[in-house]
Amino acid sequence: MKAIYLVIILTFPLHADKIRDFWFNGAEISSFTLSQSRYGKNHPGHAELIFVTEPFLSGKQVKDESGKGDSTDVLKLNSLTTFNTGIYSYHTMTSTFRPTDLEKFPHALKSTTSIQDWCGQAFQQFNFRKNGWNIQVRSYFENVGDKDLVLPSAHLEDEVWITLRLDPKKLPIGETEIIPGAIFTRFNHQPIAAVKANAAFSESGGNRIYTLTYPSLGRILAIHFDTVFPHIIRKWEETTKTGTTTATLNKRMMNVPYWELNKPEDAEKRKEIGLDPVAN
């Protein structure tokens, strides 16, 4: 029993050290070739996943820039997609803030999403509080409008991507309730609510696949990632009743202080991550 107890005690610091050694040295930027299903057709585009750690005030739920207050380290994911549907363009972005201490914090603290196209824009924000998820929705469109609501604690699909990178063993497995991704709910005019899903792991081509199946939505999300830490995301597939969206890893850069690369000559760096010099 003493030996087993010692192994358990040592496991957590070792994994925490791995997280700190890898993730606290600048951002990871990955570009993906996107085929986005929209309006029953597939449209070419690109996607970026930007993972970076930063100090975060767990009370105010904003970046800790003063060095005062209840600060905790989070792994932030900025997930972006860009694609055109015929003549007009779409831009989406989701920012999710997940504490690296998975034992102390059961969920992300915050997740925000914005969608812009030529018709208008929409925004929603999730804040995790003692009473569950506090949600704000703001939209140009009448059938969505402006609303505030509270949902009981449940896993966010948008936090799954970060948990997967930190420790896949912490992901929900089997039948569970998950709040689907914000982009999906907005694109498909779905109510914001926890939905029954089946979560499972599988393997293919030396990689692991984490799959979320939502029977009531007719939707499957499959994320392909490396078996070993840091569990690099290689591709994802989202299948719905109207089509399948795929994103495949193009290029990846580590230890990038992108917030400092803001001069005209730094645009050359965009080529290194597979992006055009001028954003589109």
Put a short name on every predicted segment.
Residues 125-176:
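Surface-exposed beta-loop interaction hotspot
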Residues 3-12:
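Sec-dependent N-terminal signal peptides
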Residues 17-132, 169-280:
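Acidic, serine/threonine-rich low-complexity disordered tracts
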